[in-house]
Structures are given as C-alpha cells and as structure tokens.
Amino acid sequence: MSVELELRLRGPHAGMDAQESLRTVQSVLSLLRELENSETARPSRHGTRWSFNELRLGSVTCVLEPLRIAEHSDYQVVERVLRTAVTGLGEAETAERIPTGWTARAASLGQQVARSLGASPDVGMFVAVRADGVEVRTAEVTQRTAFNLQAATRARLRTFGSRRGRLSGLVEGKHRRPRAVLRTEVGGEVIPVSFGDDLDTELRRAWRRDRVEVTGEITENAQGQVVQVRATEIELLPTEPQLSDDELRAGFWPDMTGGQDAVDYVEALRGGN
C-alpha cells in the first residue's frame, strides 16, 4: 500500500509569497520528523526523507510520499505518523489542547505550520492522508490552530506526581540530560521526560520495558495535560497491571478510606452505622 500526504495552501498568499509557502511545507516536514522520533525507540536527526509526487504550478499544492524510510523507522510507523499529524491538526483547529499522540514539541511545530495561514478555510490549508490514492484522513487548518496550540503549550501548573506507561525516543548526550518520551497507559499522552545523571542505571533498566512509573516534577497546561516531567525516580512495573485482593477491596488509595471498603466508607460519609 502506498501512502501520501497532500498539502494545499489556499488564498492569495499561496501564489504570492514563495518564502512563506516553502516555510510552511518545511514546518510540516519538521512536524513529521518529531512525530516519527516519538514513535521509535531511539530518535534520529535524519528521519524519513520525502519526495514530491505532485507539485502544481501557479499555486501551492503538493503531494509528498516517502523517498527513503529512516533506519530507526518502518512503513507502519510512517503511516501512523501521517495519520497522527493530520488528525492532530484537525483537533488543534477546534480545541486548546495538545493533540492526541503529539508531544509538546510537536505542538510547537504545529504552531509554525499554521502561523502564516489566514483566519478562514478559504485562506488556510487543506491536508489529507491518501492510501493508494484514496483519502483516509483530512483536515482544514487555519490561523486558529496556531492560537490553540500556543495556548495548549503554555505552562500553568507545576506539581509533584507520577505517570505510568512505556518509554521511547531516548536521547543522550555528553553535555545534556538524558531525555525520553513516556506514552502513558491512561489517557494516551505522549510526555517528554528529562532524567538526572543519578538515574542513569534506573533508566537503562527501564528501557524498552512494557510498563514503568516515572515520578517527578510535572508541568501541566490549563487543560490538565502534562507538558513535561523532570524525573526523580523510575520504578519498573509488572508487564500486566496487577492488583492484590487487599487493593481491590480497599481501592487504589487505601489510606484515603482508612482501610475500609468502598461501601463502608460511603456509608460512614453519609452518617450510617
């Protein structure tokens, strides 16, 4: 199956400002690279390369297809990336939240994609994923997307807590903290996580584990979505979520109920015997 991405810039700016138009296309390619890196075990500066399958004169309408799949990726990842990109742009057009499957960095790149667009679809951009020539995902993108993503990436609250999920996208360097992406098992968030050097051993043990719990300083946006985590602890978890009989009787937070089961606790709140 062949997979392609169609981009169609509308309005007078599409045929007038070549620099802005090319910058928009470049921002789309940067967004695809970021989404691809968050999907794979280890990211790379050299992601999948793309070629123009169609490029029409007199307007900015083009169709991109994979030219060479990156070594750290595969065809299934590339197809997921395209669907995630288009679906996410559609979500960002309607809500001030980080789109499903996007990191905060992807949201910042999405801002760049939409920054030069107009305020209505007739001066915006149409994007579509095509599989074997058939449209399977579409979105209309306007300047509203840039405003919504800017609001979504603005930090509003810092707390201390934890999230559970699977680590991917590990980046290491001599002069920078190790970084990775946590795909949460609840809510499906894709969260950038930074680790201190003191967590190097724990990080390597946790790498490619199905389930880990990362504890640390959590930065959230106004919608309660996690923008990033500065980890202070990593805990390895069983492959499948497991609860003991005691946990099932008393709940996930038995201290909250004083060890009582849910029925007794609610009756006590109501003043029952």
Where are these regions (language model features)?
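Structural detector for short beta-strands of small beta-barrel domains
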Residues: 158-175
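Protein-protein interaction interfaces in oligomeric scaffolds
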Residues: 1-142
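Short nucleic-acid-contacting surface segments enriched for D/E, G, S/T with interspersed K/R
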Residues: 197-215, 226
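Short aromatic-glycine-enriched beta-strand elements
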Residues: 173-183
